[in-house]
């Protein structure tokens, strides 16, 4: 099974970079996240994010997110619902409002100092239709992520690597697998409730017209109550 997964990932990687006329972009992300327990298996979350692209020269996106989640199976499984407001710079050169709803299921297993997470997420993006330029509304994605985390014993440091596939489900002309995201992160626990995370992220367009490879550097302040 591991060999099969490795072969699939290698084939996908070769296919991604074999596409002609790929362009490259660099950007940055600054965000803050907070989690709070509601007692028992229930919890709340919130996130604020600012993202820059075009070689750090353009403000690309402002995101506000709130969510509620439920843990079960001795905290191995987490089911969450999120609602997002996004203010994003689009391809036509102006900022538009977007709304997003997401439903996700995350399963976690631990082995010694390693943590393995598999997340499956259904996400719908709702566009502002006053301009009439969106052919598909809402746009529905199915996202699947594998994340491996390592934390040395008695250490404030934590290291993680994840890969995520984006599958567009409701566009008859462009539907299918269209993005691969890879994230490498390092977390440092500042205090009992606060953690600072630095990360590098790579987003690769797959099998689309005018594919772009986007590279981001980011910082996230995390709080847990």
Locate predicted features.
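Hydrophobic h-region of N-terminal signal peptides that target proteins for export
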Residues: 9-17
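Start-of-domain marker
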Residues: 19-78
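Residues that define the transmembrane beta-barrel architecture of outer-membrane proteins
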Residues: 24-28, 60-64, 97-101, 136-142, ...
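Residue-level signature of outer-membrane beta-barrel architecture
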Residues: 36, 70-72, 107-109, 150-152, ...
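Transmembrane beta-strands of outer-membrane beta-barrel pores
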Residues: 48-54, 72, 83-89, 109-111, ...
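Outer-membrane beta-barrel "beta-signal"
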Residues: 105, 213-225
């Amino acid at each position: 099974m591991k060999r099969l997964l490795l072969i699939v990932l290698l084939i996908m990687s070769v296919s991604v970079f074999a596409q002609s006329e790929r362009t490259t972009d660099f950007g940055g992300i600054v965000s803050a996240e907070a989690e709070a327990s509601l007692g028992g298996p229930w919890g709340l979350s919130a996130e604020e994010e600012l993202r820059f692209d075009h070689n750090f020269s353009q403000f690309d996106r402002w995101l506000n997110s709130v969510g509620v989640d439920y843990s079960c199976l001795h905290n191995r499984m987490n089911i969450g619902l999120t609602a997002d407001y996004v203010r994003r710079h689009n391809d036509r050169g102006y900022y538009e409002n977007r709304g997003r709803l997401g439903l996700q299921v995350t399963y976690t297993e631990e082995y010694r100092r390693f943590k393995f997470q598999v997340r499956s997420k259904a996400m719908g993006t709702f566009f502002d239709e006053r301009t009439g330029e969106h052919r598909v509304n809402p746009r529905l994605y199915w996202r699947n992520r594998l994340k491996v985390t390592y934390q040395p014993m008695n250490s404030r440091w934590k290291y993680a690597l994840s890969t995520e596939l984006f599958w567009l489900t409701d566009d008859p002309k462009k539907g299918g697998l269209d993005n691969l995201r890879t994230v490498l992160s390092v977390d440092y626990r500042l205090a009992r409730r606060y953690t600072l995370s630095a990360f590098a992220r790579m987003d690769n367009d797959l099998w689309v017209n005018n594919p772009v490879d986007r590279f981001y550097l980011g910082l996230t302040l995390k709080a847990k109550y």
